[in-house]
């Protein structure tokens, strides 16, 4: 049984998501100078999703996954680590990571459905930052807190606010507070980042 919260998006919602993607601001080669940034400045909104199982698998393909193996490689891993596999509906030991694409297993472990990888959300917050700082900026420090699952069907919006502008050890730094919420307004992740920006004075 599905989790009981599948709400199909309207065409208008999908168009609004498309507009956010089409207008995503990527600073790139245009420097963002430290002198031009002020406390209270809002970063452009970034969107991720709507989440799909296909998207979850794409992320797993990109980073490899800890236990995702097939055929003889899966067998070899089970031989080396007999307690690793969790039996599926065919009584076959399978990897615990299948909570990200196996709806029934995700529900069995108490999740709201097949859901995204937590580390991917960390990468989304850093993506939000690198879009904003541009090629001449440097992501000095980042912190991310994962607050809930993002099951398939969720859309996520990432916003940020400049909270501090300061100089430390000769570096021109800016601190950003970030927040990622679903299309229902649920807090999914939050974080902070400290970035180094270039100066108009060329220092």
Language model features by range: what are they?
Residues 30, 141-147:
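Short structured motifs
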């Amino acid at each position: 049984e599905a989790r009981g919260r599948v709400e199909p998006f309207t065409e208008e919602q999908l168009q609004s998501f498309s507009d956010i993607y089409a207008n995503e601001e990527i600073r790139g080669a245009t420097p963002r100078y430290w002198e031009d940034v002020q406390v209270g400045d809002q970063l452009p909104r970034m969107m991720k999703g709507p989440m799909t199982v296909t998207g979850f698998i794409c992320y797993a393909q990109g980073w490899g996954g800890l236990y995702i193996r097939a055929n003889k490689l899966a067998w070899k891993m089970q031989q080396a680590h007999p307690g690793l596999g969790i039996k599926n509906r065919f009584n076959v030991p399978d990897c615990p990571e299948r909570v990200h694409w196996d709806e029934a297993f995700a529900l069995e472990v108490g999740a709201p459905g097949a859901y995204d990888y937590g580390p991917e959300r960390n990468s989304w917050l850093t993506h939000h930052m690198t879009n904003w700082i541009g090629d001449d900026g440097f992501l000095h420090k980042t912190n991310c807190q994962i607050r809930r699952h993002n099951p398939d069907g969720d859309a996520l919006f990432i916003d940020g606010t400049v909270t501090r502008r300061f100089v430390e050890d000769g570096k021109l730094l800016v601190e950003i507070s970030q927040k990622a919420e679903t299309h229902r307004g649920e807090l999914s992740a939050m974080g902070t980042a400290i970035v180094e920006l270039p100066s108009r004075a060329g220092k």
